[in-house]
Amino acid sequence: MSDASHRFCIAPMMDWTDTHCRVLHRMLTRHARLYTEMVTAEAVIRGDRQRLLAFDAVEHPVALQLGGAEPERLAEAARIGASFGYDEINLNVGCPSDRVQSGRFGACLMREPELVADCLAAMRAAVAVPVTVKCRIGVDDQDPEHSLRALVARCVAAGVTTFAVHARKAWLQGLSPRENRDVPPLDYDLVLAVKRENPALTILLNGGIATLDDAALHLTRFDGVMLGRAAYQNSQILADIDRRFFQGEARSVEDAVSDYVGYVEEQLARGAPLNAMTKHLLGMFNARPGARLFRRHLSENATRPGAGVAVLREALAHVMPHAMQAA
């Protein structure tokens, strides 16, 4: 394997895995590898780099996911990303959204494995950190038995050895991005076959992994797993990752959230809005007593002008009253 932290990864998720989300996840697990939201190469090159790329040092190991289809632009974006200190640069070959397709990148690149390889070769030549791929098994009417193998072969020829594979096809027309996460059937066996045909590669399985028990089962056959929606829909499960998969200690959810309160205070002092940070807590206490009141309090109050850390403390009193009394 290329890195021990690839054993358990938290997937890049648009509109979700920003730096605040990643800091929270790091407070729950010290060892899992974190990924940014996808950032387009053009945004990196022409946009506000500090806003798009800056991250907290506690996030390491953390990967930057790029979107694009022009080798030279991706190479420049990768170079800029590496200068910010990211541990890995990942190319998005899996997002099926119309907006991404219109830029000729994301999942539609499954149809152009030679171009993907050219992009990766340029990126690898530009940076010293590992360059990796996140992909689907195919798109639309492609035969996944061929499309996945063709992509992997081209990427390997370009020097890439780590693949995060969402074990579903993507339908570029007729399904929304949300539907593309559920409707196309999973084909774990195909991804496993590719792993067995390429034992030296690091293959991370993504798609349909909802619990740590699911992850443990897949880790008997794959090098790593990549957890998506469950990481924010039921964030508390992340607290047991280190114990189960890295021979570390489980983290108390209460301790992690208490640490996050301190982070929120620091960010508020720097001008960040409260709701930008509290939205990442909404899935933390699922099925716990007081969870509904916690979510309601945040939803009703965190977006109010001038909302401060007191709003968060009041909400947390519904789910972890003893910790809030001690604070």
What are these regions (language model features)?
Residues 43-52, 97-127, 172-192, 213, ...:
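Active-site-adjacent beta->alpha loops and helix N-cap segments on the catalytic face
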Residues 11-13, 37, 65-67, 92-94, ...:
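A cross-family glycoside hydrolase active-site/sugar-binding cleft signature
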Residues 1-4, 8-14, 20, 118-121, ...:
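Alpha/beta catalytic cores of nucleotide-metabolism and tRNA/nucleoside-modifying enzymes
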Residues 61-132, 137-144:
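Active-site beta->alpha loop and helix N-cap motifs at the rims of alpha/beta catalytic domains
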Residues 40, 68, 95-97, 137-141, ...:
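Active-site-proximal loop/turn and secondary-structure-junction residues that shape catalytic pockets
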Residues 36, 87-97, 157-170, 227-230:
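Non-cysteine beta-strand/loop elements that form the S-adenosyl-L-methionine
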Residues 2, 13-87:
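Glycine-rich, positively charged N-terminal anion/phosphate-binding segment
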